[in-house]
Curated annotation (Swiss-Prot):
This is Required for respiratory growth protein 9, mitochondrial. The lineage of its organism: Eukaryota, Fungi, Dikarya, Ascomycota, Pezizomycotina. It comes from Arthroderma benhamiae (strain ATCC MYA-4681 / CBS 112371) (Trichophyton mentagrophytes). PANTHER family: NEUGRIN (PTHR13475:SF3). Residues 1-27 form a transit peptide. It is found in: Mitochondrion. Required for respiratory activity and maintenance and expression of the mitochondrial genome. GO terms for cellular component: mitochondrion; nucleus. Signal peptide: none annotated. It comes from the Eukaryota. Belongs to the RRG9 family.
Length: 316
């Protein structure tokens, strides 16, 4: 190739010369190619003082181009060696994943876990227990702690053993005012349950309406008069409104003299030493009509329900 500047017109000639180097069948000298390229490179205008002798010619070894073009990439399956930083990170992660030693549980937690294993039902009873029943539980357990144990009392009263344990452990006792208030609330709860049973149809509905107060007054006066006659004669007067042809049921008092003592039927009122400070528990025989009349004025609906329960039978 003639010594001409490397321009766009001479690019094809240079590419053709490079292609000939890739094929070994064509004998091409690398020295002539290097000298031709060095001769075609011209310095820029800023370096006009420099002569072409300052440029070092390209020294390409023999068959270097062939080795570059026929190079086969080789991949290694061996993982690279870890650096010191990576090894320290791995050791820190392995130390953090180790389980920490468990701290000893406090005494209250140990007791709580033991109670959970022993009483699986928990302490919450399946039903509410009246104050009289709780007092009976305490008395029975004090009489014979082996026979009336926690398990036996729980099976008899249908509550959880944990509730029995807490009742026996409790040392709180209600005062006189608190006892009266508790009994009043318990009576209200009993009446509320009876009314709910009436609404569900499990009991006879009350014929008297709640909006008519005169009916309640009539019922209370009727009950008061029947109590007064009972106190004088000793028995109830015959009822004139009985249906004809239906024999009257005669009530015979039960003889309990030959009956054996059953400790499960003992209530707090039958036990000695039971404190009864409520005015409703200390009624005497002389004051019973007065007390019943006062209760009839307070709860006429309950009195009417009790009267109807003796006269009629449910349609179950």
């Amino acid at each position: 190739m003639s010594s001409q500047p490397l321009t766009a017109a001479n690019i094809f000639a240079v590419l053709r010369h490079l292609r000939s180097l890739c094929h070994p069948t064509r004998p091409v000298t690398t020295a002539s190619f290097a000298s031709s390229i060095a001769s075609q490179i011209t310095p820029s205008r800023a370096y006009n003082n420099y002569t072409p002798t300052h440029y070092t010619p390209l020294s390409i070894p023999k068959n270097s181009a062939l080795k570059q073009w026929h190079f086969v990439a080789s991949y290694s399956t061996v993982p690279p060696a870890k650096t010191e930083k990576e090894t320290t990170e791995d050791t820190s992660l392995s130390k953090s994943t180790k389980p920490k030693p468990k701290k000893p549980l406090p005494a209250w937690a140990v007791q709580k876990n033991a109670l959970k294993e022993k009483f699986k039902e928990g302490w919450k009873p399946r039903k509410k227990v009246s104050p009289d029943t709780m007092e009976s539980i305490r008395k029975l357990h004090s009489m014979d702690s082996v026979k009336f144990s926690t398990k036996n009392l729980a099976e008899e009263f249908k509550i959880s053993p944990e509730a029995i344990r807490r009742i026996l452990k409790s040392k709180w006792r209600a005062t006189e005012a608190e006892e009266i208030d508790r009994r009043n609330r318990w009576e209200k709860r009993k009446i509320r349950i009876q009314e709910q049973m009436m609404e569900l149809g499990l009991r006879h509905t009350d014929p008297t309406s709640k909006d008519d107060p005169s009916a309640e007054e009539v019922l209370s006066q009727r009950h008061y008069s029947s109590n007064a006659i009972e106190d004088l004669s000793g028995e109830y007067p015959p009822q004139n409104r009985r249906r004809e042809g239906i024999p009257q049921k005669r009530i015979v008092p039960e003889d309990n003299s030959s009956r054996k003592f059953d400790p499960w039927e003992v209530t707090a009122d039958d036990l000695l030493g039971t404190k009864r400070d409520s005015f409703r528990d200390n009624w005497s025989k002389e004051d019973s009509p007065k007390a019943r009349s006062s209760s009839s004025q307070r709860h006429p609906r309950r009195i009417e329900y009790n009267e109807r329960s003796y006269k009629e039978k449910p349609d179950w």
